[in-house]
Structures are given as C-alpha cells and as structure tokens.
UniProtKB/Swiss-Prot annotation:
Motif (NPA 1): 127-129
GO molecular function, one term: glycerol channel activity
Role according to the record: Water channel required to facilitate the transport of water across membranes. Does not mediate the transport carbon dioxide across the membrane.
Family annotation (InterPro entries): Aquaporin-like, MIP, MIP/Aquaporin, MIP_CS
Annotated source species: Laccaria bicolor
Domain characteristics, as noted in the entry: Aquaporins contain two tandem repeats each containing three membrane-spanning domains and a pore-forming loop with the signature motif Asn-Pro-Ala (NPA).
Keyword Repeat found: yes
Family to which the UniProt record says this protein belongs: Belongs to the MIP/aquaporin (TC 1.A.8) family.
Record topology, Extracellular segments: 88-100, 166-199, 252-283
Gene3D superfamilies: Glycerol uptake facilitator protein (1.20.1080.10)
Organism lineage: Eukaryota, Fungi, Dikarya, Basidiomycota, Agaricomycotina
Motif NPA 2, residue numbers: 257-259
Main location class: membrane
Topological domain spans for side Cytoplasmic: 1-66, 122-144, 221-230, 305-332
Record-given protein name: Aquaporin-7-1
Length: 332
C-alpha cells in the first residue's frame, strides 16, 4: 500500500542482530537506584596498608605467641624469686615474703600461664629445647624453628626487663647502690649452680631434668596415652613443674629452658652486670642451661618414642599394622 507504511520484522540471517537489539534495549550501565543497591551490597574495600598489616600479623602470630608465653614465664618466675630473696633485707621488707616453695610455685604458674596464652596458637612450646624436640619427633616444621627460638629468647629479655624495672629500687637497696651489681641479684634472673657442684654434675642435673620434662610433654600430648584436653594441659604442666622444682631444682636452679636463662642473661648484660655473667665457671651459661637442656630434651623424646609411643608421626616407628592394613597389603 503506497499511502501507508507497514512495519514488518524481517528475519535476519545474522544471529547477532537480535542480540544487538536486546543490548540496545537494556544498556549495560545500571540505573541510579540499581547502582546504589550494589554499593550497599559490596563489601567495603580495605586499604593496601591495612592488608599489609594483616599479612604481617598473620606471619608473626605464632612467634608472638611464643614471645608472650616466655615473657609471662619470666614475669611469674623471676618475679617470685625477686620477692622472696629481696625481702630478706630488712630495709626492703619488714619480714621475709616467701620461701623456695614460693619460687617453685612462681615458675610453675609461669609455665601454666605461658602455655595457656600460646598453646592454641603456636603449640605452647615456650622453650627452644622443646621446639627442637618437637621438630625431631613430632614433625614440627624445621623452617619455623629459628623464628620460634628468636621469639622465645626475646620474650625472656623483655620479661626480665619488666621484672627488673618493677624491683629496681629493692635491688638498689639490696646491693647497696644503683651502680653495684653482683651475682647475688643476677641469680634472681639467670641460673647459677651451688658452689660444691662440679661441671659434670651441673650438666647432668640440667640434662636429667629436661629429659624428664621432654618425656612428660610428649606423654601429655599423646592422644593414644590418655592425654588431657587442651584446657587441662597447662594445669598438668603446672603440676609437672612443681614436681621438677621440688625434686631436681636445688642444685642448678633448674633452667630446663635455654630461653629462660639466656634471655634474662642478655638483659643483665645490658644492665651493667658485666662480663662475669658469661665468664662464670668457664662459660657455664652455654653448656649447662643451653646445651644440656637441648640434649636432654632429645634424650627424653628418644626414650618415649622408642619404648612408649605408638603413633605414626615419629621417625621411630614401632606400630604394628592392623589386620585390615595387612589384608590390604596382601591384595595390593
């Protein structure tokens, strides 16, 4: 019809033609109301700086747990030693404030509190000797060992610094002046052996006590051997340390832990106690509270895994295959 224009939809051989029409009808740019809704639904974007901080926190979380665990250990342990010994001076306190049992309880409480703080995050080693033993016998990654040990020693330094700052005036009175520092107060933070102890006896005492500690730690974390729940493990360690202090603690002040001795000793060296800290008994600081505990922990782990442990994650494997495993092996 010439006077009318009739619009008819012609089929197109191009399959994209309909698509292009739909695209024109529904543009990609959302309406303003739709865009506002999307903004509310989108999660807030974090700045790159905050993301970096979160990454750093995640990377150092386990070592920091070890740091705080050892710091608490020193605060309770060295703090109790300071209170007991310094109070024997009548110019510091009117009466004695405690006994060896008080010091023993202080260290036991310190190990329990340190384990509670760090146990669920880093495993609660708070001891380089235990960290190395766990890497040897329980598959703890060796790549994490250096960061753990560094954090543990640093925790010992900071813990000793806090206790020293708290008792500095009492230490001044006890020593006779601000610039007088002797073994009498150094022994409140670092370990020293009794005068009659020979070098071999000192080494053996620390070796034996740490071997017992290591064996008990492996037993307390062995699910096949009636291990306590995670919440009760620190209490078990508390009881263990009371026993170790009461039985093996007198002669060398039972370091059992390189970070417990070396960390505070480093702080004392920075606080004016001099070279005597490291010259005492031909480098006693190295072979008694560091080497002996490390070797003792290895010996304790070796004994436990050789004669008692029945798990699969030890280099010493004694577990017999079950009947099902034997049948599977025969089929294969």
């Amino acid at each position: 019809m010439s006077g009318q224009h009739q619009i008819t939809e012609q089929p197109s051989g191009n399959p994209l033609s309909r698509t292009s029409t739909l695209i024109q009808e529904k543009p990609l740019t959302p309406t303003s109301s739709h865009a506002e809704t999307q903004k509310h639904l989108e999660a807030p974007r974090q700045s790159s700086f905050l993301i970096q901080l979160q990454d750093i926190r995640h990377a150092i979380r386990m070592p920091m747990a070890e740091f705080f665990g050892v710091a608490l250990l020193i605060i309770f342990g060295a703090g109790s030693a300071c209170q007991v010994v310094l109070s024997t001076n009548p110019n510091v306190a009117s009466s004695d404030r405690g006994s060896f049992l008080s010091i023993n309880l202080g260290w036991a409480i310190g190990i329990a509190m340190g384990a509670w703080v760090s146990g669920g995050i880093s495993g609660g080693h708070i001891n380089p000797a235990i960290t190395i033993a766990m890497a040897t016998y329980r598959g703890f990654p060796w790549r994490r060992v250096p960061s753990y040990i560094f954090a543990q020693v640093l925790g010992g330094v900071v813990g000793a610094a806090l206790v020293y700052a708290n008792y500095i005036h009492a230490i001044d009175i006890f020593e006779g002046g601000r610039h007088v520092r002797t073994q009498a107060t150094a022994s409140l933070f670092a370990t020293y052996a009794l005068p009659y102890m020979t070098q071999v006896s000192c080494f053996f005492s620390e070796f034996l006590a740490t071997a017992v500690l290591s064996m008990m730690v492996l037993a307390l974390t062995d699910n096949r051997n009636g291990a306590p729940t995670n919440g009760l493990l620190p209490f078990a360690l508390f009881v263990l340390f009371i026993g170790l202090g009461a039985s093996l603690g007198m002669e060398t002040a039972y370091a059992l832990n390189p970070a417990r001795d070396f960390g505070p000793r480093l702080f004392l060296a920075m606080s004016g106690y001099g070279k005597a800290l490291f010259n005492y008994r031909s480098q006693y600081w190295l072979w008694a509270p560091i080497i002996a505990p490390v070797l003792g922990a290895q010996a304790g782990g070796l004994l436990y895994d050789t004669f008692l442990y029945d798990g699969d994650n030890s280099p010493i494997k004694w577990r017999r295959a079950s009947s099902q495993e034997c049948q599977l092996a025969e089929v294969v």
